[in-house]
Amino acid sequence: MKAYLELMQHVLDHGTDKADRTGTGTRSVFGYQMRFDLAQGFPLLTTKKLHLRSIVHELLWFLAGDTNIRYLKDNGVRIWDEWADENGDLGPVYGYQWRSWPAPDGRHIDQISGLLDMIRRNPDSRRLIVSAWNPALVDDMALPPCHCLFQFYVADGKLSCQLYQRSADVFLGVPFNIASYALLTLMVAQVTGLQPGEFVHTFGDAHLYSNHFEQARLQLQREPRALPVMKLNPVVTDLFAFRFEDFTLEGYDPHPHIKAEVSV
C-alpha cells in the first residue's frame, strides 16, 4: 500500500492550506490517482489496523438500497451516526441513488441491477457507470456523496473499477473507500463470471484535516506489510445475496490502530 502513503506524503508536502465546511481546516490537493492490482492482494491498509466489519456492512447496506442507520447500528457499525436524524434517517444518500434513482417520469432506476445486466450482455460498453450525485436531491442528503461516481471496464476476462471521489478525507475515509470499492469489484467479478482486474482511485479534492497531521506523520514512519487475501463464498452468484459471513480475510497483519477525530 505504498501508493496510499505516497498520497499522504504528497498532500503534506504539496497541499494548500484551506478552510473547510467543518471549520477544522485542511491541507488539500486537487487531482490525484492511485492504482491497485487486485491480483496482488486485497488493498486493506497495513500501516494501521482497519475495522473490516464496518467496511463490509456499509457496502452491503449500500447495495440493499438502505438509507437508515438501523442495520448498521444493529451490526456494531457507527460510522454514519453523526449525520443521521433522530429516526436514523440520512435522506436519499448512496443506497437510494444506487438502487432507486428517481426518473422524471416517475420511474425509479436500479443502477446496480442495470450495471450487472450490461456487464453480462455488453462487457465492452463504455456506459458501465453508477452515479450517486443527483443534483436535484443533494440538499436533501445528510451528507452529499463523497465517492460519487464509479465505472467498470472489462478486458481480457478481467473486471476493473474506477472511482471518482470529489472529496476525500485522506487519513480516515480513503482507506475505507479503497477497501470498499475493491471488495465491490471482487463481488461483481464473481457474479458476472470475470476475474478481478484493477481498482483505480481518482480524486478531486484530496485533503488531510489539520488535526490529522500528527497521525499521518506517524503512519508514514511505518513500513507496509504484505497484503491480505479476501476470499468470497464461491457459491454466491447473486450480488444482492451476499452476507457478512460470505467474506473471509486471510493473512491480515497490520500495525496498531491510530486514533483520529472525525470532522462533521
Swiss-Prot record:
Keywords carried by this UniProt record: Cytoplasm, Methyltransferase, Nucleotide biosynthesis, Transferase
SUPFAM superfamilies recorded: Thymidylate synthase/dCMP hydroxymethylase (SSF55831)
Catalytic residues (positions): C146 (nucleophile)
CDD domains, A to Z: TS_Pyrimidine_HMase (cd00351)
Primary localization class, coarse: cytoplasm
Pfam families in alphabetical order: Thymidylat_synt (PF00303)
A molecular-function term among this protein's GO annotations: thymidylate synthase activity
Binding site for (6R)-5,10-methylene-5,6,7,8-tetrahydrofolate: H51, D169, S263
A GO CC term assigned to this protein in UniProt: cytosol
Cellular compartments annotated: Cytoplasm
GO biological process: dTMP biosynthetic process; dTTP biosynthetic process; methylation
InterPro entries: Thymidate_synth/dCMP_Mease, Thymidate_synth/dCMP_Mease_dom, Thymidate_synth/dCMP_Mease_sf, Thymidylate_synthase, Thymidylate_synthase_AS
Pathway annotation: Pyrimidine metabolism; dTTP biosynthesis
Catalytic reaction annotation: dUMP + (6R)-5,10-methylene-5,6,7,8-tetrahydrofolate = 7,8-dihydrofolate + dTMP
Top-level enzyme category: transferase
Sequence positions that bind dUMP: R21, R126, R127, R166, S167, A168, D169, N177, H207, L208, Y209
Protein EC: 2.1.1.45
Family (UniProt): Belongs to the thymidylate synthase family. Bacterial-type ThyA subfamily.
Subunit (UniProt): Homodimer.
Protein purpose: Catalyzes the reductive methylation of 2'-deoxyuridine-5'-monophosphate (dUMP) to 2'-deoxythymidine-5'-monophosphate (dTMP) while utilizing 5,10-methylenetetrahydrofolate (mTHF) as the methyl donor and reductant in the reaction, yielding dihydrofolate (DHF) as a by-product. This enzymatic reaction provides an intracellular de novo source of dTMP, an essential precursor for DNA biosynthesis.
Protein name per Swiss-Prot or TrEMBL: Thymidylate synthase
Organism: Laribacter hongkongensis (strain HLHK9)
